[in-house]
Curated annotation (Swiss-Prot):
Keyword tRNA-binding: yes
Modified residues (3-methylthioaspartic acid): 102
A GO biological process held by the record: translation
Lineage: Bacteria, Bacillati, Bacillota, Clostridia, Eubacteriales
One Gene Ontology term, aspect cellular component: small ribosomal subunit
Protein name listed in UniProt: Small ribosomal subunit protein uS12
Functional note: With S4 and S5 plays an important role in translational accuracy.
Gene3D superfamilies reported in the protein's UniProt record: Nucleic acid-binding proteins (2.40.50.140)
Classification via InterPro entries: NA-bd_OB-fold (IPR012340), Ribosomal_uS12 (IPR006032), Ribosomal_uS12_bac (IPR005679)
GO molecular function: rRNA binding; structural constituent of ribosome; tRNA binding
Keyword vocabulary terms for this entry: Methylation, Ribonucleoprotein, Ribosomal protein, RNA-binding, rRNA-binding, tRNA-binding
Gene name per UniProt: rpsL
Length: 142
């Protein structure tokens, strides 16, 4: 507990909240070639590396991860959700915020079913999250 004099001298600091997805809060003005402070829900980027990585301690798997260079010039790691994907180097993808708890440094998800990213094949439930189209009426009875 500070004394009254200490508070007069220093004062209290207001704690500023850090963003969970800082790359989505920077834009880039290509005409002026300057970074801007523009928040956006998603950003477009180009895959530079598509690889698998292993999760933290209690879990074991090969998680699919892509390194993406965004339109604002920042390069981030993004998780590729769902079973199977068609991404490779130079694929254009859309990323959204959302970390993967057991992969350190992965703070973004790739949006399936947009741009060069195909939706998950044969996905029947939670289709909108994986970019899967609605199956035809005849194919539903399986």
């Amino acid at each position: 507990m500070p004394t009254f004099n200490q508070l007069v001298r220093k004062g209290r600091k207001v704690i500023e909240k850090k963003s969970n997805s800082p790359a989505l809060q920077k834009g880039f003005n290509s005409k002026k070639k300057k970074p801007t402070d523009v928040n956006s829900p998603q950003k477009r980027g180009v895959c530079t590396v598509v690889k698998t990585s292993t999760p933290k301690k209690p879990n074991s798997a090969l998680r699919k991860v892509a390194r993406v260079r965004l339109t604002n010039g920042i390069e981030v790691s993004a998780y590729i959700p769902g079973i199977g994907h068609n991404l490779q180097e130079h694929s254009v993808v859309l990323i959204r915020g959302g970390r993967v708890k057991d992969l350190p440094g992965v703070r973004y998800h790739i949006v399936r079913g947009t741009l060069d990213t195909a939706g998950v094949a044969k996905r029947m439930q939670a289709r909108s999250k994986y970019g899967a189209k609605r199956p035809k009426a005849g194919a539903a009875s399986k």
